[in-house]
Structure formats: C-alpha cells, structure tokens
Curated annotation (Swiss-Prot):
One of its GO terms (molecular function) is nucleotide binding. Its cofactor is Fe(2+). It comes from Psychrobacter sp. (strain PRwf-1). This is Probable cyclic nucleotide phosphodiesterase PsycPRwf_0181. Belongs to the cyclic nucleotide phosphodiesterase class-III family.
C-alpha cells in the first residue's frame, strides 16, 4: 500500500482487538496534520440537513432506527413553496415529489470533491449535519466520512441542538426543543496544520435558530489568539456579518460585536469559515476574511428579505488551501449537472 501524502490522525491508525480498523463510534479527530509540501488543503462541507426519509423519497440508504428499516435523505422542497416562511407547512412538504434529496446531494458533493485534482488533507463540516436529531444519523455520517480515509472534524449548527416539534403546524404554533449536541461535535478544539492553526467553536444555542458564541468561548478564543505563533482560521456555523437578507439576519450570531472586540487586538486571526446562510460569500472585516459556503443541499437566494430558495444555485462546497508562507487561497465548487 502506497504511503499517505500527509501524516494521519490516530483515527486512521486505531486498530480494534480483532485487528480490523475500528469504526468511529467515538471518533478522535487529529490534533495536528503535517504535509511534505507545507500546504494543507481543507474541504469544507456545510448544512447537510440529513433526516429520516419519508416513503415518497427516492434515495435509499439503509440504516437501522429503533430496529425499524429506515432510509436517510434530506429535506424535500416543493417548487411552489420557494417563497415565504422557511418553516411553514407549505415550505416543507413530504407529500410531493422531492426536488432535492439531501443525502444523495451530500454524497455527490463529497464524491465530486474527492475526485478533483486537489489533495484533501482535512474535511471540515460546519454545522447543521441533520434536520432531526437522532444518533443513528450522526453515526451513519461519521462512518461515511471515516470511509474516505481522510481526517475529519464536525461542529454543531442550530439544527444539531434544536428539534422542531409540530412541523405540520403553522410556524408560530410550533415549539423548539433544546438538545445537547452530539458528543462528537467539536467545541473549543484546536488543530495544528503545518504553520497554521484552526480553531473550532460551537456557536449554536439549544432551542434557538440564532447563534451565540458565549463568554466561555470568547475567553478561550482570546487565550488561543494571544498565545498563537501561527496564522489562525476559525470554523463556526453562524454568520458574523449581516447578509442583507432580513429573515436570515434575524438568526445571526447575537454576540458578533463582542466577537470582533475580542479578536481586534490580535493579528493572528486571518479567516473565519462558516455555513448557516446556504450561499457563497467572501468579505473582509478588520483584516479578517469571512467565507460563507453553499449548502450541500438547497440554497437561499441572496439579498431577499423574505425566505426565498435560489432556483439557479447548485449545491456546493468550499476548498481552503493554507500555505506554508501564511497565505490562504479559497474557492467554491458547485455540483456538476451530471453528479448525484
């Protein structure tokens, strides 16, 4: 077997008692990745929104849920429900032919990305892994990422800590049940990437759609930046600057001002990458590059004050290439027409 092009995490070398590669029931992300050429390439995937399928969906990926035969896919969007409240009964309709199958779309994005002529050294999933909280959904996803043979790290989004109860009811009559995030989702976790450092922060709030970093995370962040001798990139879910869409900006990071005050004294922070907004953007603020990334499923139309799906934007993912000289290159790739 040919040697891997980069150092691998303990997750890759962990062997069970029977001599077989152990499945990541409690996977251990790496604390450090090094490459011979000094470049670390990160594949960012976000907003997968996996959930247990309904009989109407056509993608069939079998797993067990409470000993019942189930399938995994994603949210099914109705063409007639592309405007209005994203949580309305019309906007999420399981009785129509699905337009987007989120599991199939995620799988197509992952397969396409790993077939590109780009060496992938780390996969980062920035939240909203699921749309309904079940351990089996996470386990299925972790096993799929594990099968890639590439180190991976996942953080929580709002859907990973909040279950929406009464989806058949009007939005204002529904309740939001808080949950603790899956134990394998990272928070206040750092990883050395050659001459870079990536910090993983949980911005999700159980029972809420908006984000909040919180005092503990901000203090941890200030300590990491104060003691870092490397350029730093942060991975989190919620956006830190308005997207100029009223409906999504109602669910921004609530303590974004405190975040910017916390990082202002430090020059180490170079970039923040996240999801939540289901669209691609690149901006700069206080000398920091901010990247939002398309969902691997459905997209939101930019610049709309009311919830609007983007008919023309395809699912996608982001590459981040961290160079040994402290520079960063990043680009978005969309799913090809013949993929998935």
């Amino acid at each position: 077997m040919a040697p891997l092009p980069h150092s691998v995490s303990p997750r890759h070398t962990q062997v069970a008692d029977n001599g077989r590669l152990s499945e990541p029931t409690d996977y251990h992300p790496p604390t450090e990745i090094s490459t011979d050429d000094g470049t670390v390439n990160i594949l960012q995937l976000t907003d997968l929104h996996l959930y247990f399928d309904t009989p109407k969906a056509t993608h069939e990926q079998d797993i067990n849920k409470d000993s019942a035969h189930q399938t995994i896919t994603g949210i099914c969007q109705n063409n007639s429900a592309k405007r209005g409240n994203p949580h309305s009964a019309d906007a999420i309709n399981h009785s129509v032919t699905p337009v987007i199958h989120n599991y199939a779309s995620f799988e197509a994005c992952l397969t396409q990305a790993l077939s590109e002529d780009v060496r992938c050294d780390l996969i980062v999933v920035t939240g909203d892994l699921v749309s309904e909280i079940h351990p089996q959904l996470y386990q299925h996803l972790y096993q799929r990422l594990h099968q890639s043979g590439i180190p991976f790290a996942c953080i929580a989004g709002n859907h990973d800590v909040t279950d929406e109860i009464g989806k058949d009811l009007p939005f204002e009559q529904r309740s939001f049940e808080p949950h603790e995030p899956d134990s394998r989702l990272l928070s206040r976790y750092s990883m050395k990437l050659n001459g870079w450092e990536i910090l993983f922060i949980n911005s999700s709030v159980p029972g809420q759609i908006f984000g909040r970093i919180g005092n503990k995370n901000l203090y941890w962040l200030s300590q990491k930046l104060a003691n870092s001798h490397h350029p730093v990139i942060i991975a989190m879910h919620h956006h830190l600057l308005p997207m100029h869409s009223a409906w999504i900006d109602a669910h921004i990071t609530q303590d974004a001002t405190e975040f910017w005050q916390t990082v202002a004294p430090f020059n180490a922070l170079k970039a923040v990458v996240g999801g939540h907004v289901h669209q691609s953007s690149t901006r700069s603020y206080q000398g920091v590059q901010l990247y939002s990334t398309p969902s691997t499923g459905y997209q939101f139309k930019p610049g709309c004050d009311d919830f609007t799906l983007d008919d023309e934007a395809k699912p996608g993912y982001r590459w981040l290439s961290l160079k040994a000289n402290g520079t960063l290159q990043s680009w978005v790739v969309r799913l090809e027409d013949n993929a998935g």
